[in-house]
Design a protein with these regions (language model features):
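An amphipathic alpha-helical interaction surface
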Residues: 149-151
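Catalytic cores of NTP-dependent nucleotidyl/adenyl transfer enzymes across multiple folds
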Residues: 1-124, 133-147, 159-207
Length: 207
């Protein structure tokens, strides 16, 4: 038995951890950068974000933690950027992974190295070039919610309601395969673009 007064320790919950980890999946800003042999870590951040997103139950906490951590990390790196710049980095990263070498190929080779390396680090299922893009759709939607200051993260209950949505954007053909491969992932992609376009993002091209 220990003696003395008990200490109250505050432990970050899943929502806090998600907000924190999302800032690390932004290789051109506050995240783990390319070129330092950390490609596996970059993909692990993406996978962790997707896994935590399945359990997220407090979007406002994710939003608050993300905003704080993004600003702290930017300051630590001496970057004159705002959280919105970090979120755009994450969104572009998601699109790159969806594009499978068709969008930002120089970046994709780094992601693919991480995707190939992560197989021995997950306990169930497999991640490959195709289904990594499916995970990226949901992460992109979360980033879009944060970027556009959405009031909530709306989970998709009926993916069939989104299957007929189409976007005439340059580069869209490179990710249209998602519609037939994974209707749920495509629904989140649609929801992300529906948030982003009215605010002037990706109105002409996703490249």
């Amino acid at each position: 038995m220990s003696e003395g007064d008990s200490l109250l320790v505050t432990v970050p919950d899943k929502n806090c951890v998600l907000g924190d980890k999302l800032t690390a999946f932004a290789p051109h800003t506050t995240g783990i950068p390319f070129g330092i042999d950390k490609e596996l870590e970059i993909i692990k951040q993406m996978f962790d974000c997707w896994t935590l997103l399945q359990e997220m139950d407090d979007y406002q906490t994710v939003e608050a933690v993300y905003d704080h951590v993004a600003q702290v990390e930017a300051g630590y790196r001496g970057l004159s950027i705002q959280p919105k710049d970090v979120l755009l980095d994450t969104i572009q990263s998601c699109l790159c992974i969806m594009g499978r070498n068709g969008i930002r190929p120089d970046d994709y080779r780094h992601y693919l190295t991480g995707i190939n390396a992560i197989q021995g680090h997950i306990f169930r299922g497999r991640i490959n070039g195709e289904n990594a893009g499916m995970l990226a759709c949901e992460i992109m939607y979360l980033a879009a919610c944060l970027l556009t200051k959405a009031d909530s993260f709306e989970r998709v209950s009926d993916p069939e309601a989104y299957k007929d949505f189409a976007f005439t954007l340059k580069g869209m053909k490179r990710i249209n395969y998602i519609r037939s491969v994974d209707p749920m992932a495509y629904a989140y992609l649609v929801k992300a673009l529906q948030l982003l376009q009215p605010q002037g993002y990706f109105t002409d091209s996703i490249l």
